[in-house]
Amino acid sequence: MSHSVKIYDTCIGCTQCVRACPLDVLEMVPWDGCKAGQIASSPRTEDCVGCKRCETACPTDFLSVRVYLGDETTRSMGLAY
């Protein structure tokens, strides 16, 4: 089942999500939009198993990283039958 990982612009660049991911799905990339000068990126979503450890590790009030499991992705896009 395919999962998607969305990084929101509320990311503070703390690297907690990157360190929490057991499969190295996430990485940090340069970004001028926050004090840390970096933001999480999800270049390897095909490896995501949906454990949501990245979500749990995120210290922001609004989860800056969200994992949408395959069926959640379909529902959120209005494609559920």
Swiss-Prot record:
Cellular compartments annotated: Cellular thylakoid membrane
GO molecular function terms noted in the UniProt entry: 4 iron, 4 sulfur cluster binding; electron transfer activity; metal ion binding; oxidoreductase activity
Entry keyword annotation includes Protein transport: no
Topology in the lipid bilayer: Peripheral membrane protein
Catalytic activity: reduced [plastocyanin] + hnu + oxidized [2Fe-2S]-[ferredoxin] = oxidized [plastocyanin] + reduced [2Fe-2S]-[ferredoxin]
Keyword tags: 4Fe-4S, Electron transport, Iron, Iron-sulfur, Membrane, Metal-binding, Oxidoreductase, Photosynthesis, Photosystem I, Repeat, Thylakoid, Transport
Cofactor: [4Fe-4S] cluster
InterPro entries: 4Fe4S_Fe-S-bd, 4Fe4S_Fe_S_CS, PSI_iron-sulfur_center, PSI_PsaC
GO biological process: photosynthetic electron transport in photosystem I
Keyword Electron transport: yes
GO cellular component, one term: photosystem I
Residues covered by the 4Fe-4S ferredoxin-type domain: 2-31, 37-68
UniProt: [4Fe-4S] cluster 2 binding residues: 21, 48, 51, 54
Binding site for [4Fe-4S] cluster 1: 11, 14, 17, 58
Enzyme Commission numbers on file: 1.97.1.12
Comment on bound cofactor: Binds 2 [4Fe-4S] clusters. Cluster 2 is most probably the spectroscopically characterized electron acceptor FA and cluster 1 is most probably FB.
Function: Apoprotein for the two 4Fe-4S centers FA and FB of photosystem I (PSI); essential for photochemical activity. FB is the terminal electron acceptor of PSI, donating electrons to ferredoxin. The C-terminus interacts with PsaA/B/D and helps assemble the protein into the PSI complex. Required for binding of PsaD and PsaE to PSI. PSI is a plastocyanin/cytochrome c6-ferredoxin oxidoreductase, converting photonic excitation into a charge separation, which transfers an electron from the donor P700 chlorophyll pair to the spectroscopically characterized acceptors A0, A1, FX, FA and FB in turn.
Subunit structure: The cyanobacterial PSI reaction center is composed of one copy each of PsaA,B,C,D,E,F,I,J,K,L,M and X, and forms trimeric complexes.
Official protein name in the record: Photosystem I iron-sulfur center
Species in which this protein is naturally found: Prochlorococcus marinus (strain SARG / CCMP1375 / SS120)
Classification of source organism: Bacteria, Bacillati, Cyanobacteriota, Cyanophyceae, Synechococcales
